[in-house]
From Swiss-Prot:
Listed name of the protein: UPF0291 protein CBO2609/CLC_2481
Organism: Clostridium botulinum (strain Hall / ATCC 3502 / NCTC 13319 / Type A)
Alphabetical list of PANTHER family matching this protein: UPF0291 PROTEIN CBO2609/CLC_2481, UPF0291 PROTEIN YNZC
Keyword hit for Acyltransferase: no
Keywords: Cytoplasm
Length: 62
């Protein structure tokens, strides 16, 4: 599932839970989608951090 559809479905289930409640199946789906979303975000952060290089700075005299 692409990120936009994933977020739309998560938001839909959240709004439905506040308005009328969720079935057991929808609660399970909501948990699964939230886990999938956080796993994607964690993976993106990991990739970004792996690409970071420390740049040495010259010693400065004050």
């Amino acid at each position: 599932m692409d990120m936009k559809k994933l977020i739309e479905r998560i938001n839909f289930l959240y709004k439905k839970s506040k308005e009328e409640g969720l079935t057991k199946e929808e609660k399970v789906e909501q948990q699964k989608l939230r886990r999938e979303y956080t796993d994607i975000i964690k993976g993106n952060v990991k990739v970004q951090l792996e690409g970071v290089e420390k740049i040495p700075t010259p010693n400065r005299k004050n």
